[in-house]
A protein has these predicted regions:
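Active-site donor-binding acidic/aromatic loop of nucleotide-activated sugar
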Residues: 217, 231-240, 246
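Donor nucleotide-sugar binding/catalytic pocket of nucleotide-sugar-dependent glycosyltransferases
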Residues: 104-168
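A short hydrophobic beta-strand element within the catalytic core of glycosyltransferases
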Residues: 253-255
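Short hydrophobic beta-strand element within catalytic cores of glycosyltransferases
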Residues: 276-279
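Acceptor-binding helix/loop patch of EC 2.4 sugar-transfer enzymes
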Residues: 75-119
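A conserved mid-protein helix/loop that constitutes part of the nucleotide-sugar donor-binding site
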Residues: 18, 179, 183-202, 216-222, ...
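Short alpha-helical segment that forms part of, or immediately flanks, the ligand-binding pocket
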Residues: 244, 262, 267-272, 286-287
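Conserved acidic donor-binding segment of nucleotide-sugar-dependent glycosyltransferases
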Residues: 291-302, 309-311
């Protein structure tokens, strides 16, 4: 089969980009002829199937032939103008996206113009999505979100990512130092590292935290660790190309996200590696953990501290 995979350009190689790369490799391994594009200048009529992994522009989305298109919905962006499914009041939002109430939320965004444009084009986006042959999500949680936004249930397929625990790398990632608690991910607000630091400060037993990843919250997190008096127990290791090796070496992997994670790839990988996981029970994280993690109420710092004491 001849397949076109569409993924819009991004300056960041995040989870969606990694997923798309793996998907392309898998399709080619299955014998399909696959082209990858970040524009649609190609003649789409010559393809048997169009796979869309990320498309923020609704005008572009409307150009894909509905009968051939399979749309992978990786996150909340297609149904939330703010993209993260929480309000400017820093609360998670479970309402369907639309002119109401999103028209009041979008102007309060930092990047309010794109958010407002997404509000005004929500109807067009939903109609385009509903017309596609199939929509693929990575959790039952996300299927429920799409259904609440008017997408017919029979068009939504739940396909969790295939997690393969790779072989241990030859490099000793910590130079012999054992890892106690590990956080691996972007240092952005929704990932909840600030809640993890607060929980560490409340624990009776001092623990060491290694952080793998970078992001715009790093300066604030360093300052918070110092303010809480735990800076000597928090190691910022920056971006690492081999996070699975760090997970293998960890006594416990912590996933303190307080936004509604569509799935939770880090949690799933840690479970696949046989590592203990402590996470907030929010969004798709319970599914990603598969009943093999300690889950605590979302945002409950005391409960997180108690769970880490026992990890």
């Amino acid at each position: 089969m001849k397949i076109l995979v569409y993924l819009e350009k991004s300056d960041v190689r995040g989870g969606i980009e990694i997923f798309a790369e793996r998907h392309v490799a898998r399709l080619r391994a299955e014998g399909h002829e696959v082209d990858v594009a970040s524009d649609i200048r190609q003649e789409m009529g010559r393809y048997d199937e169009i796979v869309v992994h990320k498309c923020s522009d609704v005008s572009t989305l409307e150009k894909f032939p509905p009968e051939k298109t399979v749309y992978y919905v990786h996150d909340h962006e297609p149904i939330c103008p703010r993209s993260y499914a929480y309000t400017p009041l820093k609360r998670n939002c479970t309402r369907p996206g639309g002119l109401w109430p999103c028209i009041f939320c979008a102007p309060l965004c930092r990047n309010w113009k794109p958010a407002l444009n997404r509000v005004l084009s929500q109807g067009r986006r939903k109609r385009a999505m509903a017309g596609f042959r199939k929509l693929v999500v990575i959790s039952e949680f996300m299927k429920g979100r799409l259904f609440a936004n008017g997408i017919p249930a029979e068009k939504i397929e739940v396909k969790p990512p295939v997690i393969r625990a790779g072989e241990t790398g030859a490099e000793d990632v910590t130079s012999g130092r054992k890892i106690d608690l590990l956080f691996a991910g972007q240092l952005i607000r929704g990932k909840g590292v600030q809640l993890l630091l607060a929980a560490m400060a409340r624990m009776k037993t001092p623990r060491i935290l290694d952080i793998v990843g970078t992001g715009n919250m790093e300066p604030k997190l360093r300052a918070l660790a110092a303010q809480l008096g735990i800076a000597d127990r928090v190691h910022f290791n920056g971006f690492q190309s081999n996070p699975q090796d760090w997970m293998r070496a960890a006594k416990c992997v912590v996933v303190p996200s307080f936004w509604q994670e569509p799935y939770g790839l880090v949690a799933a990988e840690a479970v696949a590696l046989g590592r203990p996981v402590v996470a907030f029970a929010i969004g798709g994280l319970p599914e990603a953990c598969g009943g093999k993690a300690t889950l605590v109420p979302p945002g409950d710092i005391d409960a997180l501290a108690d769970a880490l004491e026992l990890s």
